[in-house]
């Protein structure tokens, strides 16, 4: 899936070490806005140390923070293991590029 929007800000970042592999991990949450008569907002996650750094570099390198971007992402539903029968969605982005309206 993809969305044209404005990348507003990094809202949360988590890091740690995998208990099984010992590798470092990172997960960032970003906020985007789709302008219009009824402005829409979406929060999504970017995973992986390298990918998170790429997104931060992309955002920091944008001279105009109101430039539209194209974000490609996946949505997936997961069942809550603590409460069977309850589900939640994850939105994970994997690509970003500057675009135009």
Predicted feature locations:
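Single-stranded nucleic acid-binding surfaces, predominantly the OB-fold ssDNA-binding core
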Residues: 1-101
């Amino acid at each position: 899936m993809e969305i044209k929007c404005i990348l507003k800000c990094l809202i949360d970042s988590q890091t740690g070490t995998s208990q099984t592999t010992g590798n470092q991990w990172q997960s960032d949450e970003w906020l985007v806005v789709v302008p219009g008569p009824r402005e829409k907002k979406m929060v999504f996650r970017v995973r992986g140390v390298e990918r998170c750094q790429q997104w931060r570099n992309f955002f920091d390198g944008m001279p105009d923070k109101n430039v539209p971007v194209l974000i490609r992402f996946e949505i997936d539903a997961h069942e809550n293991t603590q409460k069977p029968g309850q589900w939640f969605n994850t939105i994970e982005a994997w690509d970003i590029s500057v675009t135009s309206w």
